Amino acid sequence: SEMCIRDSIKRWDASPELPGALEFARYLKSKGVLVAVSHTESEYEGIKAAFEAGFTHTAHFYNGMPGFHKCREYKYEGTVESVYLTDGMTIELIADGIHLPATILRLAYKLKRVEKTCLVTDALAYAAADGMEITDPNVIIEDGVCKMADHSSLAGSIATMDVLVRTMVKAGIPLADAVRMASETPARIMGVDDRKGALQKDMDADVLILDRELNIRAAWAMGRLVEDTNTLF
């Protein structure tokens, strides 16, 4: 039912060029579901139509989508440039230091700013498992990321959110903005900023304590200290 959709589905990622995608986006938007562009080859007109239909966010920006490219003797804008030109569209960055280089992180921050840029781990079940053996023969953990065993491509991230904040700071992003992109901005994009994303009265007490090197010293979820995270005392 409509209530079930609104309560159980918060976000849907799709390629806007797929048949029926724009109509589906309009329906989801009418139910309060966030619709995100994902794994697409859409150029400007396609992204413009997608945004107008309800695709207001971009999943895993730069990954699974082309940038400026050439076809024979002609040159075309890609999804990346089209998203930059769509002022109201928000983005997310897999800022693990591997999926995107520091220069791209700075560019995205400069053009979309902290209000429209959030950080996402895209972490697999192997998050924080660097150096550990895994049972899936198709993937390997190497260089702080999950790769296809044949080294043909990245398979996913193993980063946790603190890694993303450190990576952004190392890339030259102000700490305050890096933290906002990991808290306030994603909460607002997801429509849960009435209870998440800030340390304020009557909001959920989800708190991280970091040291000067931005390593986690303690974590609270809904006001409860997370087991085995407290290294403050």
Give each language-model segment a name.
Residues 75-93, 109-121, 126-210:
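His/Asp/Glu-enriched, well-ordered alpha-helical/loop segment
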Residues 1-5:
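Short, small-residue-biased leader/transition segments that mark boundaries at the very start
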Residues 6-129, 147:
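Active-site core of metal-dependent hydrolases
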Residues 213-220:
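Short, Lys/Arg- and Gly-enriched loop/turn segments at beta-strand edges
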